[in-house]
């Protein structure tokens, strides 16, 4: 009979493996329960679309360029490009405070 020498390293590896296994099992159980609940509540639920090229959004539709979207500023009444909205609002709202 050969006995395995018990070292601190082997004990710590065993504890780590037990902790990781327990954590993984807990996460899998929670996610499985959540998926079953979602399928029960929303039977027609579709999962998000994944496009490896990055040209489609999560619904499988063509992405719109941010510069093609315009937002109406209620403060000054101008249409501002979506990618410039934050800078516009900062300028637009600070002008109103000076008056």
From Swiss-Prot:
Binding site for Zn(2+): 73, 76, 88, 92
Effect caused by changing residue 86 to D: Moderately impairs deubiquitination activity of the SAGA DUB module
GO biological process, one term: chromatin organization
Major localisation: nucleus
Disulfide partners: none
InterPro entries: SAGA_su_Sgf11, Sgf11_N
Example of a GO cellular component annotation carried by this entry: nucleus
GO molecular function: enzyme activator activity; transcription coactivator activity; zinc ion binding
Alphabetical UniProt keywords: Activator, Chromatin regulator, Metal-binding, Nucleus, Transcription, Transcription regulation, Zinc, Zinc-finger
Claim: Zinc is one of the keywords in the record: yes
Subcellular locations according to the entry: Nucleus
Source superkingdom: Eukaryota
Assembly information from the UniProt record: Component of the 1.8 MDa SAGA (Spt-Ada-Gcn5 acetyltransferase) complex, which is composed of 19 subunits TRA1, SPT7, TAF5, NGG1/ADA3, SGF73, SPT20/ADA5, SPT8, TAF12, TAF6, HFI1/ADA1, UBP8, GCN5, ADA2, SPT3, SGF29, TAF10, TAF9, SGF11 and SUS1.
General remark: Present with 672 molecules/cell in log phase SD medium.
Function, in words: Component of the transcription coactivator SAGA complex. SAGA acts as a general cofactor required for essentially all RNA polymerase II transcription. At the promoters, SAGA is required for transcription pre-initiation complex (PIC) recruitment. It influences RNA polymerase II transcriptional activity through different activities such as TBP interaction (via core/TAF module) and promoter selectivity, interaction with transcription activators (via Tra1/SPT module), and chromatin modification through histone acetylation (via HAT module) and deubiquitination (via DUB module).
Membership in a protein family: Belongs to the SGF11 family.
Domain notes for this protein: The long N-terminal helix forms part of the 'assembly lobe' of the SAGA deubiquitination module.
Protein name: SAGA complex subunit SGF11
Native source organism of the sequence: Saccharomyces cerevisiae (strain ATCC 204508 / S288c)
